[in-house]
A protein has these predicted regions:
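Transmembrane alpha-helix termini and helix-breaking/packing motifs in multi-pass membrane transporters
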Residues: 62-69, 120-126, 182-202, 273-274, ...
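Juxtamembrane intracellular "pre-TM" segments in multi-pass secondary transporters
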Residues: 19-40, 219-251, 435-447
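Helix-loop boundary and gating motifs at the non-cytosolic
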Residues: 25-85, 242-287
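Substrate-agnostic recognition of the 12-TM MFS/MFS-like secondary transporter fold
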Residues: 41-58, 81-97, 101-116, 133-192, ...
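C-terminal transmembrane bundle of multi-pass solute transporters/carriers
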Residues: 7-10, 88-92, 99, 115, ...
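Helix-loop junctions on the cytosolic side of multi-pass membrane transporters
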Residues: 154, 158, 200-228, 417-432
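Hydrophobic/aromatic positions within or immediately flanking transmembrane alpha-helices
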Residues: 44, 60, 76-79, 106-107, ...
Length: 452
């Protein structure tokens, strides 16, 4: 096969365009700064495989609980128990991330996830799985996630450096969202043919990919913080609160977590009750959301430096609100797929820009705490979003819950965008700022703009 490919590439005539195209493709890939680092390539490859398995488990588990209980509320509680420990522990986890050997502890914590998936598979295969077992394992997984998430996020900058951080975050998000396409699609097939236990076992095996990637990372090429500086648990919050742009984005992220992202918790009920779909259709909706998010993440990974970061964040936030509001009003599967693509793309753009602005504004010795604060909001508050969306979906229907959440997100996005000058003309701040995207926030008296 290799010889055939070489022959085609080096052949003349009509096929001689390949030697001209392939270097351009290679150059485009290498232009993504984070991929120039071997350690990051190992990390992201393992992450992608593992995340595909994680999404397979997530889809199969949600559908299993829905079949066991026939309750939107009890299905949403899986997300609640998985995320509630993050609310309690992730700020502490962020402080720990600033102090520990991140590679070693990531390997330890990923091993726990492997054991949890294996336990679910054994229980399901033996016919012993019950809703209390699901809740208990979700709770234990949440405890580990409270430490794993800030450690993993803070490890990105150590692998690629601050100048390539946005592309690393975008590629990490791309892996997450591409796996959201692949995982649910595979789960729909595997769950329908082999049952949920197979999905859980596949997830357990997938963790070996990320463990191998972490093991092969060369620690000599990792730029860890050697300053020795330490800060209290409030340092991350105090830093964000002092800067106008990060403060606004944190407020907006809080609203999105409580009223926007909660749609994932009630998507199984929306698929069945509003669209008349079964597990295959639910997997298709999840994949549509993942396709949109992956498109947004890959776009920013490739050309994100060309955009004004805060403008992208706020425009994407407005698009999230509009797409969710419309999604709650439709009952046609094809239209719902299109709207979920838009919602996924917009959420990814907003999340990546927010995460990048927060991390690049933070000094090295408190970056873990800033990431911990972000995780506290995005994951720790998610149980409350899932709970309120599930309760409203139970009382008034999943369509109403999604439309209401979209309306709240839209109002919040418009208010924050207006307060941060999105609808006012920008001054000409020079060619360097236009090239790098380092624009000041107009309503910031000191012109700092949140450290972008």
């Amino acid at each position: 096969m290799y010889r055939i490919i070489r022959k085609v590439v080096h052949s003349g005539g009509r096929g001689n365009y390949l030697p001209r195209v392939l270097p351009k493709v290679r150059a485009a890939i290498l232009s993504i700064g984070a991929l120039q680092h071997r350690n990051f390539r190992l990390f992201i490859a393992g992450q992608f495989v593992s995340l595909c398995g994680t999404w397979m488990q997530s889809v199969a588990l949600s559908w299993l609980v829905l079949e066991l209980t026939n309750s939107t509320w009890k299905t949403g509680l899986v997300s609640f128990f998985g995320a509630f420990p993050v609310l309690l522990l992730t700020l502490w986890g962020g402080a720990v991330a600033d102090r520990v050997d991140k590679r070693f502890w990531l390997m330890v914590l990923q091993t726990f996830f492997l054991v949890e998936a294996l336990a679910l598979g054994i229980l399901a295969w033996a016919g012993m799985i019950t809703v209390p077992w699901v809740y208990a394992l979700a709770l234990l997984t949440g405890v580990v996630s409270a430490f794993e998430i800030p450690i993993r996020q803070a490890y990105l900058v150590e692998m690629v450096g601050k100048s390539n951080l946005m592309s690393a975050i975008a590629l990490n998000s791309s892996a997450f969202n591409l796996s959201r396409v692949v995982g649910p699609a595979l789960a729909g097939v595997v769950n329908a043919t082999l049952g949920p236990a197979a999905c859980f076992f596949i997830n357990a095996v997938s963790f070996f990919a990320v463990l191998i990637g972490l093991y092969k990372i060369d620690p000599r090429e990792v730029r860890s913080d050697q300053s020795g500086r330490r800060a209290g648990l409030r340092a991350g919050w105090d830093h964000v609160r002092a800067l106008p742009l990060p403060r606004a984005l944190v407020i907006l992220t809080t609203v999105f977590t409580l009223f926007g992202s909660a749609l994932i918790a009630i998507l199984p009920a929306f698929a069945r009750k509003a669209l008349g779909a079964e597990v295959g259709g639910y997997g298709g909706l999840m994949s549509a959301f993942g396709i949109g998010a992956a498109l947004g993440a890959l776009t920013l990974a490739a050309i994100g430096q060309r955009f004004q970061r805060e403008r992208v964040a706020f425009i994407a936030a407005i698009a999230v609100g509009v797409s969710l509001l419309l999604l709650g009003l439709v009952h046609v599967f094809a239209v719902a797929v299109v709207l979920l693509v838009v919602a996924g793309l917009s959420m990814a753009l907003n999340a990546i820009m927010t995460n990048t602005i927060l991390q690049t504004s933070a000094p090295d010795h408190i970056r873990g705490q800033v990431v911990g604060l972000y995780s506290f909001i995005v994951i720790g508050l998610a149980p409350f979003g899932s709970a309120q969306a599930s309760w409203i979906g139970e009382q008034f229907g999943p369509s109403f819950a999604i439309a209401l959440g979209g309306a709240v997100c839209l109002v919040a996005a418009l208010v924050m965008a207006w307060r941060n000058g999105l609808f006012r003309p920008r001054p000409d701040v020079g060619p360097l700022a236009r090239m790098t995207g380092e624009y000041p926030v107009l309503d910031s008296p000191d012109g700092q703009g949140g450290g972008r």
